[in-house]
Amino acid sequence: MNFPQDGIKLHRGNFTAIGRQIQPYLEDGKCFRMVLKPWRERRSLSQNALSHMWYSEISEYLISKGKTFATPAWVKDALKHTYLGYETKDLVDVVTGDITTIQSLRHTSDLDTGEMYVFLCKVEAWAMNIGCHLTIPQSCEFQLLRDKQEA
């Protein structure tokens, strides 16, 4: 069985079937690590679109303040550096087989909707702190989640 990178959505209805799929892996006596955590959907396209709109708005603001290097791509990387951090990856040289461990920025596509909401809240707070007021469309998922939090 190939396990999806995002994991398996385990519930009462598929528990037995998944157990049958996993059983062959245990036949040779090997042990495995299994992590259970509440299921959350990956960050949404709405959240991604909002973040990219904000990167552009922040870029325009910073450029207007003399920071001409602050392209939307630079803003995106700077915010990910500040609020998401890095992950470690091992890369293999296909010719020599040498393994190099690198640090790379975390990807928002790896966040769930809750983690992305927290990231967006941090970005918004930072932007407000520097005087950059970001657009939040009334019907976007970020605003709907905020309304739910404040209810």
Curated annotation (Swiss-Prot):
It comes from the Viruses. Gene3D superfamilies: NinB. To E.coli ybcN. This is Uncharacterized protein in rusA 5'region. It comes from Enterobacteria phage 82.
